[in-house]
């Protein structure tokens, strides 16, 4: 069992900061934090520090923000820290082999899926999008590939029928630190298990284009899209020249209309706006008009019933 490890942490967003927080509160010593350079954000496009940088500074942990780890200077800088292990969580920079080999126990990565499934940038969203029954976190020994390293441990989590990417993100942000601390406690005693590359799937980044609803898809797929694309980029369709975001929806289990076309509204009442899809009906429960807050269907219809009259075909 390992205790009091000297750890270099590398991460950027809030998901990573949750793991850093757990390490700070543990028996281990975080001797440095690596994170992405400050980026312009907000309407004023002022430089904004990452969640990891903000947390590290609050605890007087030295922060390093190299644009790349490929330079000899950056590599010597890391070597001088003499870390036992480097923990990487949603960092965003490629780690060259020399970096992977620098710490005594190498570099560990916490990934938000059950590897080798959903390697890549959007594992949480893709698990919902694909209709997976479960997901989890994997702690792996990093190698030069993209999420291809040998698995040290994993924790599993059921995906509920109402989980969105936002809710699943929160659950995994709690599960990940637990798995990380358990793995660190046994570091050196664990036997890394090679991933089966034949079972690998890739979690491609989401795009705004993908969020545009294609009514020829099945209702089941579109309902999953609504949950997978929440909180970003948010599934939407167009009506009356406006992009209307769908914030919640359900699948109609029994047919409402036999001859409706995909995209055609076949129900518009206080319960839902029902839209025919390529297979089944999508019952839209919550909508969001441009610049407005999400509202229940009934409230939307009170002010815009002409936009959603039965028979209208949405684009």
From Swiss-Prot:
Catalytic activities: L-methionyl-tRNA(fMet) + (6R)-10-formyltetrahydrofolate = N-formyl-L-methionyl-tRNA(fMet) + (6S)-5,6,7,8-tetrahydrofolate + H(+)
Gene Ontology MF terms in the entry: methionyl-tRNA formyltransferase activity
Highest taxon in the source lineage: Bacteria
Annotated CDD domains: FMT_core_Met-tRNA-FMT_N (cd08646), Met_tRNA_FMT_C (cd08704)
InterPro entries to which the protein is assigned, alphabetical: Fmt, Formyl_trans_C, Formyl_trans_C_sf, Formyl_transf_N, Formyl_transf_N_sf, Formyl_transferase-like_C_sf, GART_AS, Met-tRNA-FMT_C
EC number: 2.1.2.9
Keywords for the protein's UniProt record, in alphabetical order: Protein biosynthesis, Transferase
Entry keyword S-adenosyl-L-methionine: no
Residues that bind (6S)-5,6,7,8-tetrahydrofolate: 113-116
GO cellular component terms attached to this protein's record: cytosol
Function: Attaches a formyl group to the free amino group of methionyl-tRNA(fMet). The formyl group appears to play a dual role in the initiator identity of N-formylmethionyl-tRNA by promoting its recognition by IF2 and preventing the misappropriation of this tRNA by the elongation apparatus.
Cited PANTHER family: METHIONYL-TRNA FORMYLTRANSFERASE, METHIONYL-TRNA FORMYLTRANSFERASE, MITOCHONDRIAL
Record family assignment: Belongs to the Fmt family.
Name of the protein this chain belongs to: Methionyl-tRNA formyltransferase
